[in-house]
Amino acid sequence: MRFSRILTVFLFCILCFSCTGKNSGRTVDGRNVPRSRPELQNPGKEQQLTIGFSIATATFIIERWNKDLKVFTGAAKELGADVIVQLSAGGVKEQISQINYMINQNIGILVVIAHDTELIAGAIRQVKEAGIPVVAYDRLIQGVPLDAYISFDSREVGRQFGRALMDAVPKGKYLVVNGSVHDVNSFDISEGLHEIIDPSIQNGNVQLVREIWLEEWSSDEALEKIDAVFQDTTDFDAIACGNDAIAGAAIQLLSERRLAGKIAVVGQDADLSACQRIVEGTQLMTVYKPIGKIGVRAAELAVALGLKARGDNSIEIPLPDKTLENHSGTMVPSYLEKSTAIFKYNIDEVIRDGFHSRDDVFRNVK
């Protein structure tokens, strides 16, 4: 209960920060954003499009999702839409309950970061039956037709993990700590990683000592499971982690054993702490995802789909980058942004984009 109250207050502060004042059409959360497209503008409050945004709370406590929400809500308001945000602290059951609540709030479109990409399918089917379009944000919901999916190429993220580790440790012992088993992205990342490292496993240059999976995207769970591995052995040369929170857990445990910086560790999301670890020399690489781009693109897509579903035939839906299968019998129009591998030598990329400030990144470096 206390955790839910803290999240509620935190969310309120974020929304106030991102949505106060008149929007200039120039920046959202310090990032360059195109001015509102006239064809997406709503004519008045009584006809205003309402977007429902359902976020699995377990993901919201991860740093990058705070940025996604601020950019998305700011861009949606630039386009004349209102956004109802619901955080599901109780897992998939609460997320389903909150989705049903938003249906009754007359939302024109639903955007979902799913807690469980399979168990949520029934609720999404009800949304579709109500005539409401659905966009899966970052996590491709399985088993039900979707109007769109927007994310980054998770297989490419896995390949970026693999390339970074193979360049740094072409021969050695590897540990792989995958993300949540409830998130299809975890499996895509794993497939991309193995695409790169498996040839070296097969020829004997790389020994995959352990590969483990987490139930949730949880740094606490990662600490527990990685510690259990380290109780058996710390004889590793490289560790691939599903995200930066997991990488942080691994590096914390390595630090306790005076091994931080001696083992190559990679993650994703370009969390501030990860960028700090990179310049400090304890993390090799993080995968940076330009949240400003995906947040704005998602807002534009959601508004276009919502207005189109409401009967505005003048709206043109942007062409997808590709279509993906989600075991629903239909292909999902998918909008995928590119990610960048960030090392110490190119850390300025996250600074130039305004993702983090130079002072923050180099705070612990003298």
Residue ranges with predicted function:
Residues 54-70, 85-94, 116, 139, ...:
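Hinge/beta->alpha junction and helix N-cap segments in small-molecule ligand-binding domains
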Residues 111-128, 193, 215-277:
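Hydrophobic alpha-helical
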Residues 15-18:
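C-terminal motif of bacterial Sec signal peptides marking the signal peptidase cleavage site
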Residues 20, 25-49, 184-185, 196-200, ...:
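Hinge/cleft segment of the Venus flytrap/periplasmic-binding protein
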Residues 57, 69-72, 83, 160-203, ...:
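An alpha-beta-alpha
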Residues 34-35, 237-241, 251-324, 331, ...:
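Exported/periplasmic ABC-transporter solute-binding proteins
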Residues 1-7:
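Bacterial N-terminal signal peptides that target proteins for export
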Residues 117-156, 166-167, 173-179, 271-277, ...:
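Flexible loop/hinge segments that line or gate small-molecule binding clefts
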